[in-house]
Each structure stands twice: as structure tokens, then as C-alpha cells.
Amino acid sequence: IETEVFVQGALCTCFSGQCYLSSFAGGNSGNRGRCKQPCRKKYFYDDAAGGEFSYALSLSDLSVGERAKDLAAAGVYSFKIEGRMRRPEYVAAAVRYCRKIFAGGNAERELSDLKRTYNRGNYTKGLAFGQDKRLLSPLVQGHIGEKVGVLKVVNGKYYVESAFRPAKGDGFKILRQ
């Protein structure tokens, strides 16, 4: 049996091919390639402690590239990388990352490039390699890049503590922890 495994990209709140949320929320069927990603929107939920808005249905992106050799040893025939609704630069970075792993090299640089191309803040290994607490990404939606440092305040002045050397064209985003 030829087995395919999804190794990189966005996870769907529903089982892929079984999503009806987009259809019910606006008549755009995810099963027909027209998903409007209602799972990526902020929702309000109310509990005993009070209510709050969050991206409660937003799953983290999957990344199991470093386990690709284990999957191949288990008989996986094909490794799938998400490309639908992604920029070509993201797909290219994901392919470079996986290729480097299969070549047996250190893929830290490629993973860093991938995170800078598109990253919701954390990756999950899903459930295939044990329960992953990073399965949901309820606090941040959209691309935030790669963490490169910490902003510090000393005597009323702001400093960035980082080993990252910025290059022309780099952008930075400051997030609260």
C-alpha cells in the first residue's frame, strides 16, 4: 500500500475533506476548494471565569520534517507539503527544509528560512508523535516570523538583545509574551 503523509503546512479544524464550517458560515465549501477559513477568525467564548475573544479554532501549522526519516523507515511512500493558498516562496522553503533532512544534513538554517517565510508562531507535530500542547494557536493569527531576540528597557531606553544580525529589507514585529 502506498502511504502518503502530510508533513508541512496548515491543519484543518475539521478532517480535511469533511469541513462544513465554511459552507455554513458563508456558503463557500472547503470541500470544493473555496474555504474562507472561518476557523482562523476570532471567536468569543464564555465560561465560569468570564468570557474572552481568541482564535479558539485556529490550529498551529504542522511540521514533522525532522521525523521524515522515521516515517520513511515505517514505509511512507509520499510526503505532502501544503501549497494551496500559500505563496511560492513558502512552498520552496518547505521543500528545501525537507530535502536537507533527507540528505542527512543539519536543517536549522532551512527551518529558520521557513519560519521567516510564513509562521504562525509555533509548529506542532500533531498527534502522530504524542500529544502536542501546541496543537492550537489561539493567541496569534497570521504570520509572525521567527523569534530573534528580546526587547529590554534599561534606564528608560529600549534595547534589543539578539544574536541575529539584521539585513537590509528585514522586518521586525514586537510581541508581548
Question: What is each stretch, according to the model?
Answer:
Residues 1-177:
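Surface-exposed amphipathic alpha-helical tracts and adjacent flexible/coil segments at the periphery
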